[in-house]
């Protein structure tokens, strides 16, 4: 029964395609010129909108792709980040993203946001004792207003970045003493018991450093989870006294702790719909036929059942081959050549396909806060959809039904449109209004496939 049904469906589609199109549905030359002029005016209006995106008043017809990037960045940053911190984040961007701005597929991290904060206040607290291996303590205050409620902390580090590599003649073992304090409250607030958390981290200085990271996830995780916006901490280093006898080792640590202000680096997972969620791409759904035993080369069936399954599959393949050979037989005489006639319907000249739309953020006057990528190609879908949409577009049967309704029953029902079907994410490195730096991965920012719907 399957073969006659397929033949009947094919015959109906064949008859529909052969049916001549009414003259009323063909646009006149004057109408075509009007349509072309309207398209040009629409394109000019789009460019006009793009050219005014940098203004203070955001247009209401802003493309959703660009609105994600523009949101909250109507003006240039009030503060500029430290040059050393910016170089570090640029290096991080190159490690995480391609030149086109898409996240690298070989990265296996589960976070999609990295934020770097420089201290908004810093002052020396205690002089220290270099002879005993204790270096001066430094008070730091970080403002985390840019961290949203949908961003969950994965990891946090104190980052020391240097203009020049710091060298040590031999490895030096040290302990970082971190004291996190409750921010001071005004006299109007109710008094509360002072909060203080002490955290020690052991590490080792080696020969050359351009930057150094100290993991502070344990003390900061409850504060970020409770949406604390001001983090007040005191940092000092204590190193083995016998290892600081060499003057170069002592001078390197002294310059690092006093002359270089550390930054706070937060690795976060943005759970909003706009963010790219790498978890789905790292854990695809396993097919039912692929069991753990099959991956190791073992069969999931006993010998008898496996043989029976092989016989059934081979018989099924023969049935499919015979059915396909019947369908491949021509339904019309070979002398009638309709290939040129069908070509205008099945393969239109302006076929639905991807087109490039390359722009630079300097055109939009966004280059003062978007650090990378410098250029963006969101791509778009444009073209005519064929009357009989094939498997190449992945369109549902409803698309063909809509075409039939438009041509045979009601012309007010629109034809299927050429629209994006798949997207890829985009990695963006941006300077926030408060001077912090953010690396973010946004979902559905670059069209990669078109379809007719």
From Swiss-Prot:
Checking SUPFAM superfamilies in the record gives:
Cystine-knot cytokines (SSF57501)
Tagged with keyword Ribosomal protein: no
Which residues are glycosylated according to the annotation? 163, 236, 255, 269, 337
Q: Which UniProt keywords apply?
A: Cleavage on pair of basic residues, Cytokine, Disulfide bond, Glycoprotein, Growth factor, Phosphoprotein, Secreted, Signal
Molecular functions per Gene Ontology: cytokine activity; growth factor activity
Q: Which Gene3D superfamilies does the record match to this protein?
A: Cystine-knot cytokines
Question: What's the stated role of this polypeptide?
Answer: Required for ovarian folliculogenesis.
**Subunit and interaction comment:** Homodimer or heterodimer (Potential). But, in contrast to other members of this family, cannot be disulfide-linked.
What's the miscellaneous note? Ovarian physiology and fertility are controlled by endocrine and paracrine signals. These act in a species-dependent manner and determine the ovulation quota in different mammalian species. While humans, and mammals such as the cow or red deer, normally ovulate only one egg per cycle, other mammals such as mouse and pig can ovulate in excess of ten per cycle. The mechanisms that regulate the species-specific differences in the number of follicles that go onto ovulate during each reproductive cycle are poorly understood.
Q: Which protein are we looking at?
A: Growth/differentiation factor 9
Task: Tell me the name of the encoding gene.
Answer: GDF9
């Amino acid at each position: 029964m399957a073969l006659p049904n397929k033949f009947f469906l094919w015959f109906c589609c064949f008859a529909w395609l052969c049916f001549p199109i009414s003259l009323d549905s063909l646009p006149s030359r004057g109408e075509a010129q009007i349509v072309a002029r309207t398209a040009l005016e629409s394109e000019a209006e789009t460019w006009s909108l793009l050219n005014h995106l940098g203004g203070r008043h955001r247009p209401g017809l802003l493309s959703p792709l660009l609105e994600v990037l523009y949101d909250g960045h109507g003006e240039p940053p009030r503060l500029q980040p430290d040059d050393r911190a910016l170089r570090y984040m640029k290096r991080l961007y190159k490690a995480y993203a391609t030149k086109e701005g898409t996240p690298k597929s070989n990265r296996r991290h589960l976070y999609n946001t990295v934020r770097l904060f420089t201290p908004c206040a810093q002052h020396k607290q205690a002089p220290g004792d270099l002879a005993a291996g204790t270096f001066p303590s430094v008070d730091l205050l970080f403002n985390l207003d840019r961290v949203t409620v949908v961003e969950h902390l994965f990891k946090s580090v104190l980052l020391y970045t240097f203009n020049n590599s710091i060298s040590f003649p031999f490895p030096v073992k040290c302990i970082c003493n971190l004291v996190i304090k409750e921010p001071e409250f005004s006299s109007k607030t109710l008094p509360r018991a002072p909060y203080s958390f002490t955290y020690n981290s052991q590490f080792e200085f080696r020969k050359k450093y351009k930057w150094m990271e100290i993991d502070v996830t344990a003390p900061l995780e409850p504060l970020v989870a409770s949406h604390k916006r001001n983090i007040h901490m005191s940092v000092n280093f204590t190193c083995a006294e016998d290892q600081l006898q060499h003057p170069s080792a002592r001078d390197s640590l002294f310059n690092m702790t006093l002359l270089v202000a550390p930054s706070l680096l937060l690795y976060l997972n943005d759970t909003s719909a706009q963010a790219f969620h790498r978890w789905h791409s790292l854990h695809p759904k396993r097919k039912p036929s692929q069991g753990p035993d099959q991956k190791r080369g073992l069969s999931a069936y006993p010998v008898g059942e496996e043989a029976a399954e092989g016989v059934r599959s081979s018989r099924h393949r023969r049935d499919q081959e015979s059915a396909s050979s019947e369908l491949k037989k021509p339904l019309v005489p070979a002398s009638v050549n309709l290939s040129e006639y069908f070509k205008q319907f099945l393969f239109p000249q302006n076929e639905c396909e991807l087109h490039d739309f390359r722009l630079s953020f300097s055109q939009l006057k966004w280059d003062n806060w978007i650090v990378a990528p410098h250029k963006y190609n969101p791509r778009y879908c444009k073209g005519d959809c064929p009357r009989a949409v094939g498997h190449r577009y992945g369109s549902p049967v409803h698309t063909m039904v809509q075409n039939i309704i438009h041509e045979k029953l009601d012309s007010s029902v629109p034809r299927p449109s050429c629209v994006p079907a798949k997207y890829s994410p985009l990695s963006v490195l941006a300077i926030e209004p408060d001077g912090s730096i953010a690396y973010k991965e946004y979902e559905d920012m670059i069209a990669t496939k078109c379809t007719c719907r």
